[in-house]
Amino acid sequence: MADKEATVYIVDVGRSMGECRNGRSVTDLEWAMQYVWDRITGTVATGRKTAMMGVIGLRTDETSNELEDDVHFSHIAVLSNLKQFLMPDIRKLEDELKPSKTDKGDAISAIILAIQMIITHCKKLKYRRKIVLVTNGQGRMSDEDLGEIVKKVKEDNIELVVMGIDFDDPEYGYKEEDKDPHKAENETLLRTLVEDCDGVYGTFEQAVAELDIPRVKSVRSVASFKGYLQLGNPEEYDSALRIPVERYYRTYPAKPPTASSFVLRSEPEAGQEEAESSEAAAATQKGSQSGDAGLTTVRTMRTYQVEDKSAPGGKIDIERDELAKGYEYGRTAVHISETDENITILDTFAGLELMGFIQTDQYQRYMHMSNTNIIIAQRANDKAALALSSFIHALFELECYAVARLVVKENKPPVIVLLAPSIEPEYECLLEVQLPFAEDVRTYRFPPLDKVITVSGKVVTQHRNLPSDDLLDVMGKYVNSMELVDADEDGDPVETFPIDDSYSPVLHRIDAAIRARAIHPDQPIPPPSERLTKFSHPREDLIEKSQKHLEKLIEIADVKKVPPKAKGRKRTRETEKPLSGLDVDALLHHEKRVKISPNNAIPEFKQTLAQAENIEAIKDATKQMMVIVEDQIKHSLGNANYDRVIEALGTMRDELVSYEEPASYNDFLGQLKDKLLQEKLGGDRQELWWLVRRNKLGLVTQRESDQSRVTDTEAKEVSLTKMKE
């Protein structure tokens, strides 16, 4: 369980915070709120009820706090007491944090008030307590009783953080020129207070610059297995090895937040209110707790139906309890009763049993099948730690890996895992990955890349499809020039692509977008951080460094640019010439097709359109396809020809849209529907029209083709018209 937290933010909203300084285009308050919103929304995103936050406004127009009778606490307002923040709290806070019309208000008194809030809320319970002061240091600050403040902060273990706008920070290397003497005194006062409290003092120059750095979520470790690492059967042999161990994730994919479905809540009618189920009530309550009273969660309802010709609609509803499980065997379902279902479950017992050992040079890395886990000795068990350490060192010295059978829980399927020793200063463990069974391995045979084997079995090493020695040499130089490892001042290799700086673009981009929309629902989402996109493209220095090798590679490999695929009207498009320059049609002596054969209708229809020189030829080919399609429908025994008809209609639709003749298809489809409606094509063909709708082969609309005169509404009306009333 995560630690309880209590954080109070003191935000300076004085009149001076509404000014723009030092060449910035935003006010001091807007600049400071970037940091405050980042911290608040980051806490809200966790959804933890134990993460409490409070907000105090400093130098406000009004006074609202429990010590407001004291003149020292005037112009200080408690905007939010310590509580779990939700979306409405963020929206409310955004409206209240605006520059005031006064510069009166004491930051030191605001710190005292924040201490009082934390003490009242946390009492003597275990909390991580924190006060964050955000100010530009322009107001009046009292230096009375600083010793008592420091004593109380240390006594209650409160972390004091002061973030100042344009504050001097020698450690970061920032110094404001022509600083106001009064502000310089306030900075010195706050720095002394923070240093005495062992807190954190910084300038917003550094804080805002570091906002682009994605924060990696700290995950509390939870054991996925607790049991024994054993060699041999300890129940039968006294010499069997048995070590208590625990298993934890070493790598596990971090997943971005998932979207949930919500609907606007509508007030139930009088008759429906009593019929509301407890599940719906719970969903409504959950929706209101989520922070928006206008939304409610969507309930999922699943029904099961079976065919019954005697029932209305041809189907009847059945309960889930009436269903039975079955396994597909060929095209038949084999039913296994619940009493016999135990035969499909393998009886296993939790444990990690060693099966054997393998030399490190004989193991192939592609055998990894899972995330990486670590195996450590049972916590607070010195005997187990000593035994496991001996086992790890033995594997390391013999350059071996161990192969083991792992069952995480009783009656869970067993997996085969590989155990590799990992020894670091003051830390030892076994790295564990899952290995495949025989059925998990995919073995494929591909032709070799360094030779060509002819039909007669002859091996050819010099071929136009094989790289030459010059090509291999140039490719090697090009690859080396793109190396991601640089050298430092001493010539030692330095990793250019450290894993600690390679953040997940999807995860952090979605998180940043959600937080931006939560704070500013009407403003556009800002672009992604450069830290997330810097690995989307090669580095400029590497591109420049490798350019000469790339040009040499293009020259030797004889790389040619493929001409782009022509776009536009198919019937006015020139025939694309192959790279060889040969006229394939002239070589094959293709004659222009006059009549389309029903046995090969689709290919011949495409070929006829490709050879068409005018619109009349396109319309003639369309008419021929109309006759063929209608004939297939008329002579279809049941739905035997329906698949062929649907394929033909889809081809006609796509081709005629490409040739900018959607009217021909729309006219044909209208005629086809009329004939189906009047049962002129072999009787009742309602199922065929349903297939036309399901495959989205309706009229071509203006949205799909500029040459069409059919609107979406008209197309929908034609598609949804019933075949029979």
UniProtKB/Swiss-Prot annotation:
Function text: Single-stranded DNA-dependent ATP-dependent helicase. Involved in non-homologous end joining (NHEJ) DNA double strand break repair. DNA-binding is sequence-independent but has a high affinity to nicks in double-stranded DNA and to the ends of duplex DNA. Binds to naturally occurring chromosomal ends, and therefore provides chromosomal end protection. Required also for telomere recombination to repair telomeric ends in the absence of telomerase. ku70, of the ku70/ku80 heterodimer, binds to the stem loop of tlc1, the RNA component of telomerase. Involved in telomere maintenance.
Family that this chain belongs to: Belongs to the ku80 family.
Protein name: ATP-dependent DNA helicase II subunit 2
Keywords recorded for this protein, A-Z: ATP-binding, Chromosome, DNA damage, DNA recombination, DNA repair, DNA-binding, Helicase, Hydrolase, Nucleotide-binding, Nucleus, Telomere
Stretches for region Disordered: 259-298, 704-725
Organism: Aspergillus oryzae (strain ATCC 42149 / RIB 40)
Catalytic activity line of the entry: ATP + H2O = ADP + phosphate + H(+)
Location in or out of the cell: Nucleus; Chromosome, Telomere
SUPFAM superfamilies found in the cross-reference section: C-terminal domain of Ku80, SPOC domain-like, vWA-like
Gene: ku80
Quaternary state and interactors: Heterodimer of Ku70 and Ku80.
GO CC terms of this entry: chromosome, telomeric region; Ku70:Ku80 complex
